[in-house]
């Protein structure tokens, strides 16, 4: 059966956000509320996942907050800031939502409520941009000709925003590979999710995460 690692009360739903520089989001929706210690553990899980999947040796970990100053946010987020600062992770401080698309971190940490809102907003903005570009390019003959001139670069740009290649959203912190996908997911997404789960098993990512949680020391509380 599937269970959380020893010493871990809550697993985190993770997602790779495919922007100009992809980053890992943890938690992306599993826990609407999370205490400071859980946020610290989500950060460690996200760090290991980022190393394994994105190949970042020392991921920059940021805490999503309503300001960059250490004293910003709720009591829980201020406590989490202290725990992350005292940890051995490459913690770069708080990060505001507006900065996420610009490569300020490799791992973005938050509770599942915040993470899910951010993910859905990014998805919506992606659709908004796509529909807007199509509308502008198809407006008249001049814009259609302009669209032909930039077609290749636009395709590259849109490909960079495609999340289907990453599969689904893995549940981090449990003993077996579990990947969540939408019920209306495309064939490409389903295939990528199967490959993703198989990769977890072959590369023993779950075991590495269990070791990471077991070795995590808590100071600064």
Sequence positions of predicted segments:
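Glycine-rich phosphate/nucleotide-binding loop
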Residues: 1-12, 16-25, 104-108, 112-220
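Short glycine-rich or small-residue beta-strand-to-loop segments that form or flank ligand, phosphate
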Residues: 24-31, 60-67, 177-182
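Glycine-rich phosphate/diphosphate-binding loop of Rossmann-like nucleotide-binding domains
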Residues: 32-97, 106
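Long, low-complexity, intrinsically disordered polar/charged segments
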Residues: 55-62, 213, 217, 221
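Structural alpha-helical scaffold elements that stabilize or flank donor/cofactor-binding regions
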Residues: 100-101
């Amino acid at each position: 059966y599937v269970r959380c690692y020893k010493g871990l009360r809550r697993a985190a739903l993770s997602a790779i956000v495919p922007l100009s520089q992809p980053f890992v989001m943890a938690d992306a929706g599993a826990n609407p509320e999370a205490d400071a210690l859980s946020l610290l553990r989500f950060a460690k899980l996200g760090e290991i996942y980022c190393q394994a999947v994105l190949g970042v040796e020392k991921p920059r970990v940021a805490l999503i907050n309503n300001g960059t100053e250490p004293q910003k946010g709720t009591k829980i987020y201020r406590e989490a800031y202290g725990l992350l600062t005292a940890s051995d992770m490459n913690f770069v401080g708080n990060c505001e939502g507006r900065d996420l698309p610009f490569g300020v971190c490799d791992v973005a940490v938050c509770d599942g409520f915040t993470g899910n809102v951010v993910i859905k907003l990014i998805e919506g903005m992606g659709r908004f941009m796509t529909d807007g570009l199509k509308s502008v390019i198809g407006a008249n003959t001049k814009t259609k000709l302009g669209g032909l001139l930039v077609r290749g670069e636009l395709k590259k740009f849109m490909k960079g925003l495609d999340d289907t290649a990453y599969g689904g959203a893995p549940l981090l912190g449990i003993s077996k590979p579990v990947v969540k996908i939408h019920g209306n997911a495309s064939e490409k997404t389903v295939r990528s999710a199967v490959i993703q789960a198989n990769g977890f098993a072959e590369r023993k990512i779950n075991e590495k995460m269990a070791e990471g949680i077991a070795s995590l020391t808590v100071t600064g509380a």
